[in-house]
Amino acid sequence: MRVTQGTFSFLPDLTDEQINKQLAYIVSKGFSANVEYTDDPHPRNSYWELWGLPLFDVKDASAVMYEISSCRKAKPNYYIKVNAFDNTRGIESCVLSFIVNRPINEPGFLLQRQDFEGRTMKYSLHSYATEKPEGARY
């Protein structure tokens, strides 16, 4: 099952050339960027691990691409994404986020249903990947 989080998530995976074009857009707008990774793909997991430091005042997209490449080498079977932040209004708001790397096998999710009083149904998602310990999921 393909995880669909962030911009472009319903499109085929971006090539490095397409990623470079998005990074050039980020730099041209003066946005800050960062690279994050995780092996827990749950949609509500908003606490991905930060790779290195946030890239403030970057003038060249190749600096961000270098960080992506470094993260890919160190974490080849993890989800890796780029976030871009705009601070023009005095706050850091995420304006662009997209996945640049995926595990070869994405095991998917289990939908758990529970019956409650009054014919109420409650649902929860469980990622099959999290059945293994962190760092050994893919």
Curated annotation (Swiss-Prot):
GO biological process, one term: reductive pentose-phosphate cycle
Cellular component, GO, one term: chloroplast
CDD domains (alphabetical): RuBisCO_small
Record-level Gene Ontology MF annotations: ribulose-bisphosphate carboxylase activity
InterPro entries referenced in this protein's UniProt entry, alphabetically: RuBisCO_ssu, RuBisCO_ssu_dom, RuBisCO_ssu_sf
Keyword Plastid: yes
Keywords: Calvin cycle, Carbon dioxide fixation, Chloroplast, Photorespiration, Photosynthesis, Plastid
Location in the cell: Plastid, Chloroplast
Signal peptide as annotated in the record: none
Keyword Plastid: yes
Complex formation: Heterohexadecamer of 8 large and 8 small subunits.
Family: Belongs to the RuBisCO small chain family.
Job description of the protein: RuBisCO catalyzes two reactions: the carboxylation of D-ribulose 1,5-bisphosphate, the primary event in carbon dioxide fixation, as well as the oxidative fragmentation of the pentose substrate in the photorespiration process. Both reactions occur simultaneously and in competition at the same active site. Although the small subunit is not catalytic it is essential for maximal activity.
Other known facts: In this alga, in contrast to plants, the small subunit is encoded in the chloroplast. The basic functional RuBisCO is composed of a large chain homodimer in a 'head-to-tail' conformation. In form I RuBisCO this homodimer is arranged in a barrel-like tetramer with the small subunits forming a tetrameric 'cap' on each end of the 'barrel'.
Protein name: Ribulose bisphosphate carboxylase small subunit
Taxonomy of the source species: Eukaryota, Rhodophyta, Bangiophyceae, Bangiales, Bangiaceae
GN (gene name): rbcS
